[in-house]
Amino acid sequence: MARLSSRELALERRKALTTSGKKSSVAAGDGANRVRTASDVRPTRTDAAAAVEPTAPAVSAPVKPTVSFTPASPSSSSHVKPQRHPSRDLVLARRDALSRRGKTADTSRDRNRADVARQTQAAAPVAASAEEQKTCGCGGKRAAGKVQLSAPTTSLKPRSDRRSAAPKRRAIENPSRALVLARREAMAKHGKTAGKQPTSAAAVARQANPDLTSRELAQQVRELRTKAGARNKQSAGATRPTGPNRHGAKQAAAADAHWKVGESTTSTGQTVTGTQANRSVKTTGNEASTCRSITGTEYLGAEVFQTFCQQAPEPTTPAKVRVTATSHGNRVTGNEVGRSEKVTGDEPGTCKSVTGTEYISANQSAAYCGSSQVSQRKVGHSLTQQGRPVSGVMVGRSSSVTGDEAGAGRSLTGDQYLGSDPLPDGRPAAKVGQSGTLSGTGVTGTLVGRSSQVTGNEFGSCHRVTGDQYISAEQVNAFCGSKPEPEAAKVGFSITNRNQVVSGTRTGRSERVTGDEPGTCKAVTGTPYAGLENAGQHCGTSAVQAIRERTPVRLGTPSAAMTGIQPGVGGVMTGDEKGACEAVTGTPYVGADQLATACGNEAPAGTDSHGQAPEGAAWTRFSVMSPARAAQQQRDDQGAVTGTSYEQGNRITGPFDLAGGKVTGTEQFRFDNREFQRRQFQPTVAVVSEPAEQPASRVTGEGSSTKITGDDWDRGEHVTGTEGVSARRRNPTRPGPMSATVPHERKRNEENEWPVSRVTGSSGNTEKGSLITVSGGARG
């Protein structure tokens, strides 16, 4: 049966699958037409002998036991055989060889027709002998029922055959290129460890072509030696031999090498560095014209003239860069463009002063003119009034300029533009005038009044105008001879009932307005819009006093005298002196007695001791206080009222809420106490005085009567306000009569006898004790 190629087998298998389905895969996978082992694949790729089986493998693997499958019946046409994968076995064998020996085990080469034709004739007799040896005498009857499994084998050829079969590479002529290529190949194979390998000629040749023989390697080394010499003879890692110097003591000190960059000095004293072109003692033939003076650039240093000529050269060429001085002492370097003794025709204008940039130095002016003229500075220097230097364009006054005399001697506010230098003399003209109004207010600025040097503005000089006053008081005094009365103040000042100054538009009574007389001398509640000076001018002393008394006094710093523990000042505690004598707003915690004792004449306004000494005026009382006087003063200082007393000192506030004739709480709610009203408001005989005859009023119409509706100008029975029975009934916060409630049950404290108090101190100092034991606050 003829052997089929892989392509023909694939076509047959596909045809069988299309006709018989998957059942034909067993018959198609029969290995009778395709028998390939691992031993015949390697020669196929290398020797191109595809159809010839090898006679004997180079390395024989142990043969595994044969597994035979016996069919159930001899007549069965289907046989199950294990599938073989020779390609897979070849790949596994190749990978195993590469993992063991690296790339040297890879013997695959590119096949061509010449190699196949050359190896076909040699492989034919070998295949025939192999077939004869395989004949066992059974005629091949047992081959159908037995499957022989053999391990893949790999035939290894000698290294010499593989090297001889490879084409001989051409030697690299450029050693640098060979070194670079060898390094790159070594880095690609071995990584960074390849850089530590020696770089000798043999190593370079071996890395370039690993298949070189010893003879070829020696030829490559000789070729590199002929081109590069013996510099690569030693290895890179070798070191030079070291040891004691046998002739070290006999060796002389090494002479200093000549400086590459020398330093020399010119005839003018300047230092020049670079390559020295001077004359040397060790060189002959350059003695001519050494000490002669030449024109142009001097290449010889001053030390050459001092060594060989014993004198300094005379400079015949002028300096290329000269240094001159200006009239102000500044140094200027560059080309000198002044007058020269060797040039004629430049004498005119030598000693004349010019404006602009100064091109002539002060040295030439002193040489040809005898003295140098100082020109004007372009950048001036001055000092401020505080002594700080200022440079720049000077904007001050100059004696050569007229018209800048105005305001030269005045001190201005803001940035200082003039220095502290003395100003030149000139005509002082006032740029900013000073004047005064008729009311005495000073005004500064440009004067727009009448002047004696201007005609035509005499009309209306002495007339009075309304509005803003543009004419000063000096003009009126100079041209009119009399000073008119000033206009009314635009912003008035008034005094309130508490002696505070208020400025603004005045809304009080005026003598030039009629109809605002009613209510001038009446005390009003609320915010007063008319100042206290109106009452003083138009009303009597009693009316002013009534207005002052009518003004409510709010709680302030100097409160009433208090008993008990007071957080005041002047005690045994230190550190409370700061701010003790200053007026504060809010609840007063310091009594007037403590404030007067601690502060004295420094007490805030509103206290009795304001502006007075605490002990009074001198020689007004005894220096020694009697016991009776001390007891009276103690009774005055420590009254029977605890807390703040607003109106009277004989009322007790605090826990004594059920004492007879005692008022609890705020005393301003006394209108609900009927007993207090009957005792306080007893009918008295009023003294009726005949009213004086009032002058006839000039006001007619509405407001002609003395009664004014609206604001409470008159405290009458027909006017409602904030006090009286009607106010008490209208205010729901104040309790009314108790007729609609349950009768009040008297408590037991009113029936018991009051004990005599034996507690002194902060209990109120009353002669009767308290029956309350739980409420707290009765006893300190």
UniProtKB/Swiss-Prot annotation:
Annotated Low complexity bias: 48-78, 117-130, 264-276, 387-403, 432-444
Lineage of the organism: Bacteria, Bacillati, Cyanobacteriota, Cyanophyceae, Synechococcales
Region (Disordered): 1-173, 189-212, 226-281, 330-349, 382-444, 631-661, 686-780
Keyword Cell inner membrane: no
Descriptive protein name: Carboxysome assembly protein CsoS2
A UniProt-annotated Pfam family: CsoS2_M
Keywords carried by this UniProt record: Repeat
Gene name of this polypeptide: csoS2
Residue span of region C-terminal peptide: 750-780
Subunit structure of this chain's protein: Interacts via its N-terminal repeats with RuBisCO. Interacts with the major shell protein CsoS1.
Compositional bias of kind Polar residues: 641-651, 759-768
